[in-house]
Design a protein with these regions (language model features):
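N-terminal glycine-rich phosphate/pyrophosphate-binding loop and immediately adjacent elements
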Residues: 4-142, 447
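Mid-domain catalytic core of redox enzymes
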Residues: 227, 257-374, 511-512
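A conserved FAD-binding loop/helix module that cradles the flavin
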Residues: 60, 473-495
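Active-site/ligand-binding neighborhood in enzyme catalytic cores
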Residues: 137-246, 253, 436, 440-449
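Extreme N-terminal leader/targeting segments of oxidoreductases
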Residues: 1-10, 28-29, 450-454, 503-517
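Structural core of flavin- and non-heme-iron oxidoreductases
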Residues: 1-41, 46, 118, 124, ...
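A glycine-rich dinucleotide-binding beta-alpha-beta segment and adjacent secondary-structure elements
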Residues: 189-203, 357-361, 417-477
């Protein structure tokens, strides 16, 4: 009888977005929730690096799909506006190409973007862009319910849920085609194919191997991108503070050494200090390969298969700077493309090396659509994609120097000069990410989304081990801040369903939130 009356105890391992959201939702429902995190602050991959006395966002920098958090917070009696200061971005990103003087802005206004493409390329390409937008809209509408909101989608359930009209949409897309091939059907200008092919990297993947369905990422951005005052770290900080107000017991600077089981189900976690936290339920918000490789105990090797190194998603080489810039008129989000795009992904996924000529993403965090008012040092994040082999090798100084020099040279050829002192840049490499996120090998997006079946290979929130649930970017529905938040909602809802606190139909509503329609 005591077990029935006892408030269910939950330990959430990892204070990334998925863990913060699941802890908050469960605490709001009255469960006894303890959150443990090895870092000394919340956020997981949302992290700030201190450079010259200022914090530089050095993880995710784009805030999209705000409806995921909007609906969750509405259920808690608050709103995003109550906990964050958001500003919509008009210029989604500014793009430049090596060897070309022209730039292209993607804008929140689709018609204005079409006008920009007509000037940059041709009126025919502008019309093709508008057709592309219509297809990505239909694709998103088709996949939102049967895939994004589903706790564990599979091919059979998706076919059933899609119905004839949904299947017609997928068939028209060519679901077995790669993203690169499909984009070649939409655009004749290779620069536009390159621009939209970059959306594969949002899932840590190559556009030559990713499925055509990843075109829906374009729709996500076109619906809206926001900047967060104080940086993306404020998202994690606000959710952590709200969780504690609802009763979450957060413990930072504490590592989970092992997840214990008893009689085949979860019984608690052991901390690195040796302390044991008893719990009937554990939500693991980390890279699931840590479970499969035995880093948290041998009990889970049969339930979780670690991602093999060649199946891992992208890692990164990042440079967090406080520096003066000149020349190129940067906005908040900027992309500098190389000439041989395919060679970049061959270097990373096949030759397993830092790209000789990699695309460079630059987040100028003190800028908005109109740029920087005064020529003063600004917070800059430069990111180059890299192979996720951080657990088996470390790049040597000459490799790092070559990649950095090539990246700066590419930006210089596009017109951007960065004047940075050596002590005002912090570099993070795949080996550093492998240390920050155990079991990942430095992969930042879990398993690469390669092949048309890859979307069904991510673990779901409910594991085969009773009482153990998973959340985060390495599980369904995938990487990125909104998807990780969705995974946290799915994990919390699945746990509550197993406790009999909600029905399956209620779980769909709770985890799903509002449509983008």
């Amino acid at each position: 009888m005591g077990n029935i009356l006892r408030t269910p105890r939950v330990v959430v391992v990892g204070a990334g977005i998925g863990g913060l959201v699941s802890a908050l939702v469960l605490a709001h429902r009255g469960l006894d929730v303890t959150l443990v995190e090895s870092a000394h602050q919340p956020g997981g991959k949302i992290r700030q690096v201190q450079v010259n006395g200022v914090g530089v966002d050095s993880g995710p920098t784009v805030f999209t799909m705000r409806w995921v958090l909007d609906q969750m917070l509405e259920n808690l009696g608050t709103s995003l506006e109550d906990i964050l200061q958001l500003e919509p971005i008009g210029v989604l990103a500014r793009h430049a190409w090596d060897g070309g003087p022209n730039t292209l802005d993607l804008l929140s206004d689709t018609a204005l973007t079409a006008d920009a493409i007509a000037q940059f390329s041709s009126p025919q390409e502008a019309r093709r862009f508008l057709g592309f937008c219509q297809q990505t809209r239909r694709l998103y509408d088709t996949l939102e319910k049967p895939y994004i909101r589903s706790e564990r989608p599979n091919l059979l359930s998706m076919v059933t849920d899609l119905g004839p009209s949904g299947m017609a949409t997928l068939t028209g897309l060519g679901p077995f085609a790669t993203l690169w091939h499909s984009l070649g059907r939409h655009f004749h200008d290779p620069r536009l194919q390159q621009l939209f092919g970059r959306y594969a990297t949002y899932c840590g993947s190559s556009p030559w191997s990713a499925p055509a369905t990843l075109m829906l990422v374009a729709q996500v951005e076109l619906v809206g991108v926001w900047s967060v005052k104080g940086g993306m770290f404020q998202v994690a900080s606000a959710l952590a503070n709200l969780g504690e107000k609802h009763g979450v017991k957060a413990r930072y600077g504490v590592s989970c050494a092992k997840i214990h089981t008893q009689q085949g189900r979860v019984s608690g976690v052991e901390l690195s200090s040796g302390e044991h936290l008893a719990a009937e339920h554990v939500i693991f918000n980390g890279d699931v390969s840590a479970l499969g490789s035995g880093l948290l105990g041998s009990s889970f090797s049969q339930s979780f298969a670690p991602v093999r190194p060649f199946e891992r998603s992208l890692s990164a080489f990042t440079m967090s700077m406080h520096a003066k810039t000149s020349g190129f008129p940067m906005v908040r989000h900027n992309v500098f493309f190389n000439q041989d795009y395919r060679a970049e992904f061959d270097d990373i996924f096949h030759k397993r090396r830092l790209p000789e000529q990699g695309t460079v993403y630059v987040c100028a965090q003190d800028r908005n659509d109109s740029g920087l008012a005064d020529p003063v040092p600004e917070r800059i994040l430069c990111l180059v994609n890299a192979p996720a082999d951080g657990d088996t090798r470390s790049f040597n100084p000459s490799e790092i120097h070559a990649c950095e020099s090539n990246s700066l040279a590419l930006m210089r050829r596009c017109g951007l000069e960065i004047d940075v002192l050596p002590q005002h840049v912090v570099r993070t490499l795949p080996q550093d990410f492998a240390h920050l996120f155990p079991g990942s090998g430095g992969a930042l997006y879990g398993q690469a989304t390669h092949g048309w079946m890859s979307a069904f290979r991510r673990p779901s929130s409910r594991s085969k081990v009773p009482g153990l649930y998973t959340a985060g970017g390495s599980v369904h529905p995938g990487p990125g801040v909104p998807m990780a938040a969705m995974s946290g909602r799915l994990a919390a809802a699945t746990l509550m369903e197993d406790l009999g606190l909600i029905s399956k139909s209620s779980r769909v509503v709770i985890s799903g939130g509002m449509s983008m329609r």
